[in-house]
Amino acid sequence: MTHSAWHDEIKQVLPKDYYRRVNRFLDEVYATGVVYPPRDNVFKALQVTPLEETRVLILGQDPYHGPLQAQGLSFSVPDSIPAPPSLQNILEELAADIGVRSHHDLSSWAEQGVLLLNACLTVPEGRANGHAGLIWEPFTDAVIKVLNAKDRPVVFVLWGAYARRKKALITNPIHHVIESPHPSPLSAYRGFFGSKPFSRANAILEKEGLGQIDWLR
């Protein structure tokens, strides 16, 4: 299901029957309708970014709900797909903060230790937040708790009210939180633009001796 270290740690936090319930849920929703991302990409964030290499967490809400967009990494779409509005604003802020990045696929961030996690890992076609509140919150809360228990600093990037509520789970003082309004067109002008999350994260990582992320890669 996930990278083995993630699996071993997460299962210590979750109820014993949780994975069985998740598999039953996935069997049902993928059999009865169109669901994104493709089933083999549901846990992609944890497969691409191992626990021991995670330096930054960027928490999204749920996957894109249009065809060919969602790929299992929050905010990321394939380069062949136009950037959705939130990703457009993320790239605009990145350009103002550090420099221009032309790729829409954020896999290279994930490969550098940026965990691109959605709070809800699946979505029905055309129904934003259609699976919210059903099965996923205990899982993604468990991921945050596992990171919180680490003895090496992690930078938690929380965009928007939903993500910012997860700050309550980050109780270990060695970690760092960068928060702002969501990059959605509805809220980006209320403080996301100008928040410089990328250079701020790199400054923290550099200070902690963890090495910077190449956000333009």
UniProtKB/Swiss-Prot annotation:
* SMART domains named in the record: UDG, UreE_C
Query: Where are the catalytic residues?
Result: 62
Q: Which Pfam families match?
A: UDG (PF03167)
Compartment(s) where it occurs, according to its Swiss-Prot or TrEMBL record: Cytoplasm
Which species is the source of this protein? Streptococcus equi subsp. zooepidemicus (strain H70)
Which GO molecular-function terms appear in the entry?
uracil DNA N-glycosylase activity
The record lists the catalysed reaction(s) as: Hydrolyzes single-stranded DNA or mismatched double-stranded DNA and polynucleotides, releasing free uracil
- Sorted UniProt keywords: Cytoplasm, DNA damage, DNA repair, Hydrolase
- Purpose: Excises uracil residues from the DNA which can arise as a result of misincorporation of dUMP residues by DNA polymerase or due to deamination of cytosine.
Q: What is its EC number?
A: 3.2.2.27
Main EC class the enzyme belongs to: hydrolase
What this protein is called in its record is Uracil-DNA glycosylase
InterPro entries in UniProt: UDG_fam1, Ura-DNA_Glyclase_AS, Uracil-DNA_glycosylase-like, Uracil-DNA_glycosylase-like_sf
Q: Which gene encodes it?
A: ung
For this chain's UniProt record, which GO biological process terms are given?
base-excision repair, AP site formation via deaminated base removal
What's an example GO cellular component term for this entry?
Answer: cytoplasm
Q: Which family does it belong to?
A: Belongs to the uracil-DNA glycosylase (UDG) superfamily. UNG family.
Keyword check for Acetylation? no
